[in-house]
Amino acid sequence: MGQKVHPLGFRVGLNGNYKSKWFVKPKDYSLLLFQDYLIRKNIFNYFNILNNSKNKKNLLDSINITDIKINRKFDQVYIDIYVASMNKVIFNTSGSNSDPLIKIQSNKIVDQLQRVLLKQVSSFNLGNKKVNNSSKIIVNIIESPDINTNAVFIAKCLIDDLENRVPFRRALKTILDTTQKQKNLAGVKIQISGRLNGIEMARSEWVREGRIPLQTLTANIGYYNDVAETKYGLLGVKVWVYKNKS
């Protein structure tokens, strides 16, 4: 049997960077690593609650997180949240031409999120260790560029269609038609596993357009996997994208 390596971890230091950047003494490493886990978990939970409260009609009405990067400097924690959304309310705006109402709503979301994170991670125990209570959390929400070539957003679009009972072949065709129009995308591969279209026997189906050179370390590969919760059970979704070098 072939052994598969994670496409992103395989390329850290070449085409990708670590999601968390900080240095700490070895005895405190597990503590901060667990704190990073709590930060990411609470961010996803916060935006899930926010999306559900908006009664979204489709995926474009929701706020989809594509990446979370954490940087630490002394007692400050900088969190960059990359999101894909058509709703400009969530983005930090600047300049004289910006709508004051958008600024207020954007700042309100950031302030609420900072309070939630500070409350959840400012004080917890891991064995006999305690985290520093004086940590300051600074959240920045950034619009994710080129969402149609982002593996996370492509997977979210497919999952949204599958959960809305769109036949999987039609959903795949719609996504491939969109990705083929992207000039900076050299290839895309999508795999779905489970009870496709409600058939009793589970199976896997995959499609590919262009090239996906997984063994080439210098290739700019994006990858994401998630599950779709359907009436007939869970469907596993995996997406690989290969972007041209800019």
Swiss-Prot record:
Subcellular location: Plastid, Chloroplast
Listed CDD domains: KH-II_30S_S3 (cd02412)
Subunit text: Part of the 30S ribosomal subunit.
Species for this entry: Bigelowiella natans
GO molecular function, one term: rRNA binding
Gene Ontology biological-process annotations: translation
Annotated InterPro entries: KH_dom-like_a/b, KH_sf_prok-type, Ribosomal_S3_C_sf, Ribosomal_uS3_bac-typ, Ribosomal_uS3_C
Database matches in SUPFAM superfamilies: Prokaryotic type KH domain (KH-domain type II) (SSF54814), Ribosomal protein S3 C-terminal domain (SSF54821)
PANTHER family, per database record: 30S/40S RIBOSOMAL PROTEIN S3, SMALL RIBOSOMAL SUBUNIT PROTEIN US3C
Protein name: Small ribosomal subunit protein uS3c
One Pfam family named in its UniProt record: Ribosomal_S3_C
NCBIfam families referenced in this protein's UniProt entry, alphabetically: rpsC_bact
